């Protein structure tokens, strides 16, 4: 199993501490929407019945949200479930995987019997036209991308993305595009989402998730959108017959219409992310611009920063488990202002104490 953030149970077992301020998982700190809680209470009345194996109500709601056909949508037990089921039924032979990226892509490809060719992106870990050249010169039948990227938060330029999709289409190559962080901020226009391109590129499948933006990772709800309805049906029939439980389906329908929470989250992130980025930069860290609800930064020579922060009850995502990254890189979720202040205070204490190998990078007050 791949390593992930948000594993507070393991942290508790290893340290004996039960209370954590978790910056390792990219979950909305605003908490579970009231609309979800209400939907779950109402849906509990139907738990004596099997869930709809076709998720008809949910797919209609998603289709209306994204302006696609319900037949172009497949729902699952989180975004990872869609990724695994898609690759399991596709069975690609040779995939190009730009790294660093979400670890489950390689795990899903490997499980599907595919040979994975890692394309190591040099710092600043940005997709460039070299990927198009690799596709043209290599022998691949699958390409996996994430936009925005996890863990960097960077995005692919729209013109370049179009070129990549055109190249893949010409080479008859399947493209799996993970957009699970795409709807986090207003700076990414929905018309540039790959969802708008599924009819022009039937070899493209876009993965989305409701987990992070609405703080419901425990419910597990993800979906894939593809212009090829036969492929969607193939994916739907791969795996168990009830991939989405009743509570998750009703909760998803509720949040899709919860405009107040959506606005509240975007307003929060619009203010909190630059504030946290500014604070990290003032401490001397190299911080990447992000289009998601997390920040990727480099703490040169500080390979135990995550462990040092545990003394303050703070969990930070160490990125040394991502292919292409070493022990200098970390990822921090954007949380509430008072929580972000605790992270910055903890980092400052670590730096002042020389807890990270004596690194001298403290530049200013936070």
Predicted ranges, named:
Residues 32-33, 54, 203-288:
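PLP-dependent aminotransferase class I/II
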Residues 22, 118-119, 142-149, 175-179, ...:
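Short beta-strands and strand-loop turn motifs
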Residues 1-49, 139:
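N-terminal "arm"/small-domain region of PLP-dependent enzymes with the aminotransferase-like
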